[in-house]
């Protein structure tokens, strides 16, 4: 038994010696390859660092700026929908305008940060103003034509906040553009029903006065908004919020212009009177001048300065002229009714 144990121990010893003799070259080989492996790891890290820098460059320089440039569009086409032969042109233009801003152009006020257009500032302000103006006009249409339930429904939908995406406060939500798309459909249906005789449009002098009064009131409110921003700008070297105010008001002014322009088609009888027509032409001309203002950079300089313009002041001037002309139009309609 002792002899067998000795043989086993000797066999283990010989195996261990051979194993160590065989492992020595492997250890030397592994030690020799350590610098090579370290170099490969370093090269791998450098390549990924370069890729990361390139990806960051693509996002910061290409994705956001190029994407924003592609999406950016402040559409102030003065001839928009002017060729419409709809029975109620104001309603037809309003529906088409909402559809244009929501579907044809990207609706930007509610886009989250991962969209390139989310970095835009002026276009969201402009579109917010357009929707706000559209809501005011839809409310007037609903008030003057109470039998058309779709108009009030549209006015309510247009009052929905413009900044809601598909998620709000981490909960699923109805997006702003979906609400506005439904509003445009309701207004378009009313216009189609009026053309077919299934709905009526109040084209009385009282209705024209309502439109003129609301437009004049809104124009004065916009002028006050601009005046308040001008007063703030006098205390600053640079006014970073001036462009937002300018384009929000300009978006509303574009709606006022289109609706004022189309009043002539919807109230033809009233416009046979020269006085009414004269004041309407002044209002439309002033509003057209307002919406065609397109400064490269909005400047809110002091009204007394000789070195910097004040684009808000210029916009307010045209809006005030239009408001006075619409007030005069109201008086002309009254005078016509008294005859």
Specify the residue positions occupied by each region the protein language model found:
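N-terminal targeting leaders characterized by basic, low-complexity, disordered sequences
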Residues: 1-29
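Juxtamembrane low-complexity tails/linkers enriched in Ser/Thr-Pro and polybasic
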Residues: 30-44
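Hydrophobic membrane-insertion alpha-helices, especially the h-region
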Residues: 50-66
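N-terminal Sec/ER secretory leader and immediately downstream segment
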Residues: 75-176
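Short, charged/polar, low-complexity loop and linker segments
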Residues: 82, 107-119, 196-199, 228-241, ...
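A cross-kingdom marker for long, charged
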Residues: 82, 256-339
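Short, well-ordered, aromatic-rich surface patches in folded extracellular/luminal domains
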Residues: 163, 167-214, 309-333
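Extended amphipathic alpha-helical interaction segments
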Residues: 177-293
